[in-house]
């Protein structure tokens, strides 16, 4: 399988997070391993109010948006919103029909964006960042989309809002160098999925995932929109979101021993140098393998940092 790197990506970390520390350690004799193990996201959008150059924000999606590739084909199961980012990235970069393109698309309704769009970054979540319970309840349970999400819908260069599918697809095509999407084909795929909500025995994996997610009260209240037809004007307007590949983490890094001391190529300890956190692949040079799980990164930082601190103290 041929994997082609994207020609363009947006940046999900500050400009100073560039891996230069690892290169300095290599020049000093340290060994880096597993540099091919990268953790990037497929749901990146350009920040309309950037803090650093090429600043990207990741959408943390609920399960209901329809996901299309660059030429307008619905992504196959289990490549659904919020499921497996690395499997989706692998699909987008290895399918010969689309590997030349660096983007994909969400198509959704206003009702979906109000309930299911969350954005990465502390500045995009003032309710959580400031531990403001009143704002949290208003934002997550009130009407309309959260303020930061609505701001992206209004100002983001990757967002298209329209009342009809023809108008929507025309706007989406305007965001790419050449028109790649066919409105009739997009509409047919959305209509087919819309109809599955009327089928109590549906085998559509995405529809089943939506129903399953709503069995949990927390998701039903705050995270997953009530099943509805995207093409019903009552649920509009329609929204298209151009998704970019966004950089985030390296799962490899400087190889260390159990005391977080950096090792040389021959396996001996490089005196005076320790590595912890992402610089050490979250521990040792790559504790995760080629995949990982959200929520497991911080633990590796804390544990390897603790080991480094204890080693330095002794």
Predicted stretch roles:
Residues 60-62, 248-250, 294:
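Short, small/polar residue-rich loop motifs at catalytic or cofactor-binding pockets
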């Amino acid at each position: 399988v041929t994997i082609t790197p994207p020609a363009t990506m947006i940046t999900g970390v500050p400009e100073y997070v560039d891996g230069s520390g690892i290169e300095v350690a290599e020049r000093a004799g340290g060994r880096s391993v597993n540099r091919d193990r990268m953790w990037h996201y497929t749901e990146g959008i350009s920040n309309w109010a950037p803090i650093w150059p090429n600043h990207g924000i990741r959408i943390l999606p609920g399960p209901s948006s329809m996901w299309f590739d660059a030429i307008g084909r619905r992504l196959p199961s289990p490549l659904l919103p919020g499921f497996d980012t690395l499997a989706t990235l692998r699909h987008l970069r290895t399918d010969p029909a689309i590997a030349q393109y660096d983007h994909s698309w969400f198509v959704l309704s206003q009702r979906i964006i109000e309930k299911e769009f969350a954005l990465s970054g502390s500045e995009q979540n003032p309710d959580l960042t400031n531990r403001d319970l009143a704002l949290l309840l208003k934002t997550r349970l009130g009407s309309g989309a959260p303020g930061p999400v609505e701001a992206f819908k209004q100002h983001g260069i990757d967002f298209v809002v329209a009342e009809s599918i023809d108008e929507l697809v025309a706007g989406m095509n305007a965001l790419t160098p050449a028109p790649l999407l066919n409105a009739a084909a997009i509409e047919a795929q959305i209509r087919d999925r819309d109809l599955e909500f009327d089928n109590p025995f549906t085998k559509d994996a995405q529809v089943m995932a939506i129903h399953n997610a709503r069995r949990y009260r927390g998701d039903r209240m705050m995270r997953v929109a009530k099943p509805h037809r995207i093409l019903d004007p009552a649920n509009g307007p329609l929204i298209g979101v151009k998704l970019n590949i966004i950089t985030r983490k390296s799962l490899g890094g400087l190889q260390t021993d159990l005391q977080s001391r950096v090792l040389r190529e021959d396996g001996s300890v490089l005196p005076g140098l320790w590595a912890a956190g992402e610089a050490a692949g979250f521990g040792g040079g790559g504790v995760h393998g080629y995949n990982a799980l959200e929520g497991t990164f911080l633990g590796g930082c804390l544990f390897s940092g603790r080991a480094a601190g204890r080693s330095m103290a002794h």
